[in-house]
Amino acid sequence: DPFNEILINKSINNIKSLNIFKSVEKEIIDDANSKTKIINISIEEKPTGEIMASAGFGTEGGSIGFGVKENNFVGQGISLDSNFLLSSDSFKGKFSVTNPNYKNTDRSIYISAEAIETDNYDTFGYKTNKTGISFGTNFEYYDDLYLGMGNSNFYEKIETNSTASARQQAQEGSYWDSFIKLDFNYDKRNQKFQTSSGFRSFYSIDLPIISDTNTLKNYYNHSYYFDLFE
């Protein structure tokens, strides 16, 4: 392919945007014999993992939390995030994995599982438990237009007693929600890392497949980038 300085810089910028290298440098060498250019890319790795632990105590009880986050799991750019928070009346836990280039197909895939429980049965007369799983994929469908498709499924159970409010008692029961998620991302930024010009339009919609409330969720965001000072 013909040498293109713009495409080279874009590739270097895409590597930097992965946020798993401390530095990324390029060297372009002219080969007079073959009349080609040799491109050497030098990278320096950086720590990409985080471990979090927390603990708190108060008049209404205590809480403990723990989390592990890794942006370059097994050296393949896979993002892993796992955390939980436990208190005297609640539990929140989540585990998610994202592979940005599944089997070198330029498609990202993700899966996430989470659980939330709130136990106020003795104090306010209600208890809720919600668990679910989400999975999907993202890929470039057309030039600079990225399409995301996913599915989320959640099961929720609500228990109440006579001390709960009338509204809470009316909500008692089991619920199953299943949604199809579609994302449309039109990305015309000049570069992903330290963007200085261009725009990005993002639209997301969650369509109910099975839902007691038949809630449809929409989200739209448009960002425009420019330099304040030259």
Please provide the spans of the model-predicted regions.
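Gram-negative/organellar outer-membrane beta-barrel architecture
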Residues: 2-202, 215, 225-227
